[in-house]
């Protein structure tokens, strides 16, 4: 079957994007993201190969505010560890790009991809290029006087990854779902799924805010926030709207509230349309994601569960896209 290699390639690319999200989370939680102070897309492919190279890289890091504030006196062995974590992060990002670009060129030249898919995948390529620049833009924000990556730029980096994943996975579903699997449905269902996907996107952005502001380190109780449904200090910043984006308490409160809203809406949609089996996959994904979020909070952000929570948000989004593709043009 001619479409099968293309479908396998799209699945692999989608999977690699999810893996990159996990690696990015591991890099952030390991506090290794600022260890490489330069961005060299081509020459940066190789790590330091000699002791002199390592000393040179360490001296560059020692000039950064992060080193002076948090890692002063760090040994060479400790530096190698965080450097290699960030190096692997960047290397796999390059590898992901190659795994996408080379087969894309081949399949396009061989006319194995329909024209509408070429446009969609070219858009994914464009966003991939933007993602590379956004990654460096994010790192650069932490190399200034305040050694802390901007949570806005962290959210942008994650959002671009989500767009790339959405384009790739939706195209993959195009190859996987056959007409015989599709049923007649009410037009309102797709509208409801779109609403849920928009809420999931906003939730992922607020997840990035929670991570960037270390908001997961406060109010480590559930369902109440230290005994309160609505915690104090929700609006202590002025102007009031700033709390939505920069107040750790408000950001965590919104993240919790959105999770419950998405769960309730997905449950209602599934119950009302019990004959549509893909909705159960989306509901199950929401339940797993909520559980991962609660456990991450209660256990004070254990690395493995926190990374799983971040990665699974993309799987949840993908389950919603699958539902959309399953129901498309069946009105």
Swiss-Prot record:
Record-linked InterPro entries: COX15/CtaA_fam (IPR003780), HemeA_Synthase_type2 (IPR023754)
EC number(s) per entry: 1.17.99.9
Catalytic activity: Fe(II)-heme o + 2 A + H2O = Fe(II)-heme a + 2 AH2
GO cellular component: a single term: plasma membrane
Gene Ontology terms for molecular function: metal ion binding; oxidoreductase activity, acting on NAD(P)H, heme protein as acceptor
Keyword Iron attached: yes
UniProt record, GO biological process: heme A biosynthetic process
Disulfide bonds: none
Membrane association type: Multi-pass membrane protein
Cofactor(s) of this protein: heme b
Keywords for this protein: Cell membrane, Heme biosynthesis, Iron, Membrane, Metal-binding, Oxidoreductase, Transmembrane, Transmembrane helix
Domain of life: Bacteria
Binding positions for heme per the UniProt entry: 255, 309
Protein source organism: Wolbachia pipientis subsp. Culex pipiens (strain wPip)
Function noted in UniProt: Catalyzes the conversion of heme O to heme A by two successive hydroxylations of the methyl group at C8. The first hydroxylation forms heme I, the second hydroxylation results in an unstable dihydroxymethyl group, which spontaneously dehydrates, resulting in the formyl group of heme A.
Name of the protein in question: Heme A synthase
Presence of the UniProt keyword Membrane in the record: yes
Gene that encodes the chain: ctaA
Family matches, as Pfam families: COX15-CtaA
Broad class of where this protein is predominantly found: membrane
Cell compartments where the protein resides: Cell membrane
Pathway stated in the Swiss-Prot or TrEMBL entry: Porphyrin-containing compound metabolism; heme A biosynthesis; heme A from heme O: step 1/1
Chain segments annotated as transmembrane: 6-26, 87-107, 124-144, 154-174, 193-213, 251-271, 279-299, 301-321
Family, as annotated: Belongs to the COX15/CtaA family. Type 2 subfamily.
Assembly and binders: Interacts with CtaB.
């Amino acid at each position: 079957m001619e479409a099968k290699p293309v479908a396998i390639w799209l699945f692999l690319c989608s999977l690699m994007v999810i893996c990159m999200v996990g690696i990015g989370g591991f890099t952030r939680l390991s506090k290794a993201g600022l260890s490489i102070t330069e961005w060299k897309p081509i020459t940066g492919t190789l790590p330091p190969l000699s002791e002199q190279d390592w000393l040179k890289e360490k001296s560059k890091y020692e000039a950064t505010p992060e080193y002076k504030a948090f890692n002063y006196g760090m040994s060479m062995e400790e530096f190698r560890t965080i450097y290699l974590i960030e190096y692997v992060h960047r290397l796999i990002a390059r590898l992901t790009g190659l795994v996408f670009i080379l087969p894309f060129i081949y399949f396009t030249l061989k006319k194995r991809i329909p024209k509408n898919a070429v446009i969609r995948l070219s858009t994914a390529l464009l966003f991939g290029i933007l993602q590379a620049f956004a990654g460096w833009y994010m790192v650069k924000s932490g190399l200034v006087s305040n050694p802390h990556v901007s949570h806005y730029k962290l959210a942008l980096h994650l959002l671009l990854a989500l767009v790339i994943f959405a384009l790739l996975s939706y195209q993959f579903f195009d190859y996987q779902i056959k007409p015989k699997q599709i049923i007649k449905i009410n037009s309102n269902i797709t509208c409801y799924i779109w609403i849920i996907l928009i809420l999931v996107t906003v939730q992922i952005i607020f997840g990035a805010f929670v991570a960037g502001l270390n908001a997961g380190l406060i109010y480590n109780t559930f369902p109440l926030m230290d005994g309160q449904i609505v915690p104090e200090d929700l609006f202590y910043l002025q102007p009031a709207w700033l709390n939505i984006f920069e107040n750790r308490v408000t950001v965590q409160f919104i993240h919790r509230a959105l999770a419950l809203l998405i769960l309730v809406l997905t449950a209602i949609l599934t119950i009302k349309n019990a004959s549509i089996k893909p909705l159960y996959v989306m509901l199950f994904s929401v339940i797993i994601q909520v559980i991962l979020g609660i456990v991450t909070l209660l256990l004070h952000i254990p690395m493995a569960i926190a990374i799983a929570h971040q990665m699974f948000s993309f799987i949840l989004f993908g389950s919603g896209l699958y539902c959309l593709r399953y129901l498309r043009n069946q009105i």
